[in-house]
Amino acid sequence: MLERLHSVPPTAPAAAELGRRLARTHLAGAAAYGVGPEGWEGDGFFGPLSAPLPMVLGEWASWGAFYAEARVTPLARMARDAGVYDAAETTRFDRIAARLATGELDTGEPVARLHGDLWSGNVMWTEGGAVLVDPAAHGGHHETDLALLALFGTPHLAHVLDGYKEVHPLADGWRERQGVHQLHCLLVHAVVYGGGYAQQAMEVTRRWVRPGAH
């Protein structure tokens, strides 16, 4: 029998505790970048329950290679095939994937155990604290979960981050890398909804693709 949870308004102390618990979850680790939960076979799913998109799972030795090959490139191709981007625009995602694959944006930290779809709608605030729902769990970079919390406006986000950093300090430059860590989610939304999400994803490439890069 499942326990019924009742929502309450979020508070700063609850947000800080969410940050601490999330950091501990990340520190529990995973066997490799891109690996699914223990016992899971095949790929996963990401996006709205009404039309989930495939989420590639596997094993990668570095975060940059994993994120380029299993997240950015497949979704950019999907967006192109859906008519969201033309060939020239898709090339910009290829360039950012190439930069990721070099390991330039890796931070040298251990693989984190991610929720994987940690936007604000998947945080339920209850009397017992925050409860995370609807995971797309896999091994990844801890900054990805934090970037998704920021993407759609999580309540008391500053307190979440403060609590997180009590347990796990963040590497220099983490704020600048947020857009890259949001890119997969933005591309999913671009495929499903188009519109402003497609533009937001393109803005990330303008920040991270060097002028004249091929």
Task: Please give the residue ranges for each predicted region.
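Active-site catalytic-loop/activation-segment of kinase and kinase-like phosphoryl-transfer enzymes
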Residues: 43-101
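ATP-binding pocket architecture of kinase catalytic cores
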Residues: 1-65
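Hydrophobic packing residues in well-ordered alpha-helices of helical domains and bundles
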Residues: 15-18, 89-93, 201
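Protein kinase-like catalytic domain
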Residues: 26-30, 165-168, 191
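ATP/Mg2+ or Mg2+-diphosphate-binding catalytic cores
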Residues: 189-214
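Active-site Asp-x-Gly
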Residues: 63-65, 77, 107-113, 120-176, ...
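Hydrophobic alpha-helical segments that form the core
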Residues: 179-187
